[in-house]
From Swiss-Prot:
Belongs to the UPF0102 family. This is UPF0102 protein Meso_4010. One of its GO terms (molecular function) is nucleic acid binding. Pfam families: UPF0102 (PF02021).
Amino acid sequence: MGAEARLSRQRAYRKGHRGEWLAAFALRLKGYRILAHRFKTPLGEIDLIARRGDLVAIVEVKARPTLGEAMEAVSFTAQRRIDAAADLWLSRQPDYARLSLRYDLVAVLPRRWPVHVENIYAAR
């Protein structure tokens, strides 16, 4: 891998990490408790898992220039991977039977507060 490609990947990683931190901060201010950051499974990765009461939000974080681009960035393939990872996470929870699950998006936009889109799959 060339030095330029490595630098580009490092920048993207840092940008993603900052975006996830900002998204988690915004969700905390809305009363959510962050249960996991970058939850990895063999089936996929979840950026954030947040909980408020009996509601668990599986949160995809996207840093894009516009909200529309952020929403479009969650492809059908990504949805399937996120669903599979969420099912695995949920199956490991002792109180899973009483939890409601929702898939959300937090769009990190330039020079703006993060936008929280609840129930991203239905919002399309």
